[in-house]
Amino acid sequence: MSKHAATPERPEQTPVPHPDRTLTVWEDGVELTFTFADCMKYHGPGFPGGVAHAFAALGRALPVLAASSAGGRVERRDITVRTPFGGPGARDTFELVTRAVTENRYNVLPELARTERGNTLARYVFELSTGDATVTCVLRNDGIVADEFIELTGKPDKTAAELAHLEVLKLQMRDRILERDPAAVYDVE
């Protein structure tokens, strides 16, 4: 039996905005392309918002890293990720695309949080490095993450109704992220 058997009933799935968007990395001369659907299949249904955050951060960072890489290619196994965001959806997306988790190049560092941005935005920071290039993706303050979502995720002893509502909030956040270009979700530093 799955340890997740007690999760709430999931809301009806809605179409994913821009399902044709892809992330491209390279491994030993072979081009690898991933869609959001690929990332969700790897992660499972639990945290579509976290998957969308990582997908957008990668979509923002990879072109910048490619511009500073030899041949314009980013080798997936050369990417290091540092973030204060510990969510499993983001972690699994970075693992699928970069293999950074199993190869110890994925680091969750709470001290990277931008606490001056407030509780809602503080942890949405992703630093990606390859070679001498580093890109830091910082979530735009544009209503992408609802305060209600942060408050409800942090609430202990959620009721069944609150858990069901949290599932809806996750899908709404996923859609707010994916209906925008990654540059409209994350700024780069």
Where do the PLM segments sit?
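Non-transmembrane, aqueous-exposed alpha-helical and coiled segments at domain scale
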Residues: S2-F47, V51-E189
